C-alpha cells in the first residue's frame, strides 16, 4: 500500500515570503492552514509541522515559532497523523557532528515542546549517524511512547550506517529530498541488503538541486534552485519488489502541492494506489 505525506511546506511558503517560514507562522497562519488542507484534499494521510528551520543556528526566538507551528497543526490531528519535525542542528551537508551542550539543550527543549502534540517524531537530515543516535536517545529519555521515524539524505556518509540506523529504537527509516531514480538505486545498493521489512519505509521526492541549495544557505533564492522534472516510468517494478506492507511518499524542496497532486494522480492511474486511499 502507498500512503502519502505532505510536500515541501518551506518551498511553498517561500513563494510568498522569502524567509524560513517564520513570517507566515506568525502573521499568515491561514496560508499554512490552506496548504495543509490542500495536501489532505489530494489524499495525504500525514502532514508535518513546519519548523524545519526554526532552530537557534538559524533564527532568534526559534522556540516561539516552533510553538506557533505546533498550534497550527492541532486541528488537523482529527483528519490525519502529524509528523513532528525534528530538524538537524547543524546545516545539512556540513562536516560538523560535535555533540555540544547547545546541541543537547536544543533537542531537549524541542522534544518537550513537541511531546503530546504530535503523533510521530520525524528526525530529518541530521549530518551523521552519531547525531541521529543522540537525538533518538534524547527523545526516548523524554518520551518513551511516541514512535520515531528517521529520514536521511542518500549520501555516501549515511550509506555506511544503514544497518546501524535500523538497529535504533525507531519505527521507520526514510530517504529525504531525492529524485526517484537516485532513491531507487540507493535503496537497492544500501537498504535492500540489510532492510528490516517490519519497519516503515518512505521517501521524499524533489525537483531541486538540493546540495547546491544546502551549501548556499540562501533561503531567499530557494526557488532558483528548482530543476525541470524528469518523467518517471519505472515505478511499478520498484514498488512490486518492496517487502514492506506500506510505503510513504512525500515531497521536499521543489515538490509542493501541484507536484504532489500530479504524483498521486500518476500513481493512481498506474494502479499503484487503491481508490479508497485518495480523496
Region spans (language model):
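Domain-level signal for soluble alpha/beta catalytic cores
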Residues: 1-279
Amino acid at each position: 500500500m502507498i500512503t502519502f505525506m505532505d510536500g515541501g511546506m518551506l518551498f511553498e511558503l517561500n513563494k510568498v515570503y522569502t524567509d524560513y517560514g517564520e513570517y507566515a507562522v506568525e502573521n499568515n497562519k491561514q496560508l499554512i492552514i490552506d496548504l495543509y488542507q490542500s495536501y489532505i484534499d489530494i489524499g495525504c494521510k500525514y502532514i508535518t509541522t513546519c519548523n524545519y528551520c526554526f532552530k537557534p543556528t538559524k533564527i532568534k526566538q526559534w522556540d516561539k515559532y516552533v510553538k506557533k507551528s505546533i498550534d497550527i497543526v492541532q486541528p488537523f490531528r482529527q483528519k490525519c497523523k502529524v509528523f513532528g519535525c525534528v530538524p538537524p542542528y547543524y546545516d545539512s551537508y556540513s562536516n560538523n557532528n560535535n555533540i555540544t551542550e547547545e546541541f543537547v539543550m536544543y533537542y531537549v527543549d524541542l522534544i518537550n515542546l513537541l511531546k503530546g502534540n504530535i503523533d510521530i517524531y520525524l528526525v530529518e537530515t541530521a549530518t551523521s549517524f552519531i547525531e541521529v543516535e543522540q537525538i533518538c536517545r534524547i527523545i526516548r529519555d523524554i518520551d518513551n511512547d511516541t514512535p520515531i521515524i528517521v529520514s536521511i539524505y542518500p549520501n555516501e556518509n549515511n550509506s555506511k550506517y544503514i544497518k546501524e540506523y535500523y538497529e535504533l529504537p525507531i519505527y521507520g527509516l526514510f530517504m529525504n529530498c531525492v529524485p526517484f531514480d537516485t532513491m531507487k538505486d540507493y535503496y537497492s545498493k544500501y537498504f535492500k541488503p540489510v532492510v528490516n521489512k517490519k519497519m516503515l519505509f518512505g521517501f521524499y521526492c524533489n525537483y531541486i538541486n538540493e546540495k547546491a541549495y544546502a551549501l548556499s544557505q540562501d533561503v531567499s533564492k530557494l526557488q532558483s534552485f528548482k530543476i525541470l522534472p524528469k518523467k518517471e516510468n519505472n515505478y511499478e517494478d520498484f514498488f512490486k519488489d518492496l517487502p514492506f506492507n506500506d510505503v510513504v511518499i512525500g515531497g521536499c524542496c521543489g515538490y509542493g502541492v501541484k507536484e504532489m497532486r500530479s504524483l498521486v494522480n500518476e500513481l493512481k492511474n498506474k494502479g499503484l494506489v487503491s481508490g479508497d486511499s485518495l480523496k
